[in-house]
């Protein structure tokens, strides 16, 4: 949990620097949207590639390498103005601004490549240490690292008035996290002298796992030609459109409503706190009442998310900030359940030998969402001068996701008795 939350420290800080950069240099939302769109696509591909790698590499060092590079890029982000000035020879004109956008774009791309080293190794660790019948609950607990990281960053950056410090302060905290991972994390039960989890039907043994041909055949069958995995992947795409739209543009949306920077930070933090509670409840309900059929919990929550988003559309201009905050928190509570449990369902279907690959494929699809949440929503906000109909769009997307996940309502995960 702590290790993956560190990745969020040097990832979600970018969103809180955007209003400050916009205010100081006049960089448009569309420019930042393009950066986030391309970066999100790169992250999706990286998550997919690292998912395959994580099934065959040491998870601890995989995490350490990725986090180290992300910390370095976050530090360099704070010097973007000086780097641009070095190449353009100016500190204020159009060339300088364009140079800053290019510098931040390049650094963001590098950051996103190595952000992909975070989720897949953690998923590999979970399926290596946790039996399938406990996976929804335990994975939901681990998934709170998303919200913990984003919550702490939101609070810290909410009180920072210089955009450079939005990058440097979280980077220093994540730097300490690197040493925590090295000292405390181990790859598999076998690496510390404990017995491995029992194998399940259809799973590769250790020798087959090392055989490239056998592993490739298993991967194609369990992941790439599995229609259920693709249903889960497309549903996760819709989940991430909603989640990322609020995380990426939340500070800008709330600033546009007239909220102070401090209150904006706390409002986004409340979304994350509610998400934490939602993940824990969803995992417990899935294992306790639905016999680990997580997709059923996802369907109910997605439908309720759609209702919340339509409500946010009507509240944003109603001068009712408390009601807006309550509904935003409820949306966070609900959307983080599917965000955690769709991966659990995919991992159980693919078995622990290909779980990271399955989750990597879902990750690739989910980060296609940045085409809409990044450039698409940013350009719409610039054109229409507000975020009103974006909430309606997100509500419609959540409704489509509900219909899609209902198609696998009766699914029984492949390795659950």
Language-model segments: which ranges?
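C-terminal ends and interior cores of transmembrane alpha-helices
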Residues: 68-96, 303-317
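Helix-loop-helix hairpin linking two adjacent transmembrane segments in secondary transporters
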Residues: 142-190
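Residue-level signature of mid-helix packing/kink "hotspots" within the transmembrane helices
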Residues: 12, 40-48, 150-151, 272-280, ...
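C-terminal transmembrane helical hairpin of 12-TM major facilitator-type secondary transporters
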Residues: 292-342
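Hydrophobic core of transmembrane alpha-helices in multi-pass small-molecule transporters
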Residues: 73, 87-117, 321-337
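Cytoplasmic membrane-interface "Motif A"-like loop-to-helix N-cap segments
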Residues: 56-67, 288-302
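Extracytoplasmic gate region of multi-pass secondary transporters
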Residues: 14-18, 226-280, 339, 373-374
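Cytoplasmic helix-loop-helix junction between adjacent transmembrane helices
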Residues: 104-146
């Amino acid at each position: 949990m702590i290790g993956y939350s560190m990745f969020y420290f040097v990832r979600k800080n970018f969103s809180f620097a955007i209003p400050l950069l916009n205010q100081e240099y006049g960089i448009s939302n569309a420019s930042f949207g393009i950066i986030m769109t391309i970066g999100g696509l790169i992250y999706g591909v990286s998550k997919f590639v690292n998912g395959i790698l994580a099934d065959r590499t040491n998870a601890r060092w995989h995490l350490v390498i990725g986090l180290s590079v992300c910390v370095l890029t976050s530090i360099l982000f704070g010097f973007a103005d000086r780097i641009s000035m070095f190449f353009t020879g100016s500190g204020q004109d159009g060339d300088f601004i364009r140079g800053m956008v290019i510098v931040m774009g390049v650094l963001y791309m590098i950051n996103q490549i190595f952000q992909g080293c975070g989720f897949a190794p953690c998923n590999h660790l979970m399926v290596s240490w946790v039996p399938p019948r406990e996976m929804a609950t335990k994975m939901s607990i681990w998934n709170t690292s998303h919200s913990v990281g984003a919550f702490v960053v939101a609070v810290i950056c909410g009180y920072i008035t210089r955009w450079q410090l939005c990058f440097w302060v979280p980077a220093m905290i994540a730097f300490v996290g690197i040493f925590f991972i090295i000292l405390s994390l181990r790859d598999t039960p076998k690496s510390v002298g404990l017995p491995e989890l029992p194998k399940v039907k259809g799973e590769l043994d250790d020798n087959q796992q090392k055989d490239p041909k056998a592993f490739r055949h298993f991967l194609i069958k369990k992941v790439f030609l599995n229609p259920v995995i693709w249903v889960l992947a497309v549903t996760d795409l819709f989940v991430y459109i909603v989640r990322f739209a609020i995380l990426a543009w939340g500070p800008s949306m709330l600033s546009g409503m007239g909220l102070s920077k401090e209150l904006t930070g706390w409002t986004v933090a409340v979304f994350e706190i509610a998400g934490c509670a939602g993940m824990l409840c969803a995992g417990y309900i899935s294992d306790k009442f639905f016999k680990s059929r997580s997709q059923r919990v996802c369907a109910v929550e997605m439908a309720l998310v759609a209702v919340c988003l339509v409500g946010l559309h009507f509240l944003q201009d109603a001068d009712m900030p408390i009601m807006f905050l309550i509904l935003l928190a409820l949306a966070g509570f609900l959307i983080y359940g599917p965000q955690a449990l769709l991966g659990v369902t995919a991992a159980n279907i693919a078995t622990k030998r290909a779980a990271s690959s399955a989750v990597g494929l879902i990750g690739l699809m989910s980060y296609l969402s940045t085409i809409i949440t990044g450039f698409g929503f940013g350009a719409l906000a610039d054109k229409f001068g507000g975020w009103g109909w974006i909430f309606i769009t997100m509500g419609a997307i959540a409704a489509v996701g509900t219909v899609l996940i209902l198609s696998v309502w009766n699914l029984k995960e492949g390795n659950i008795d």
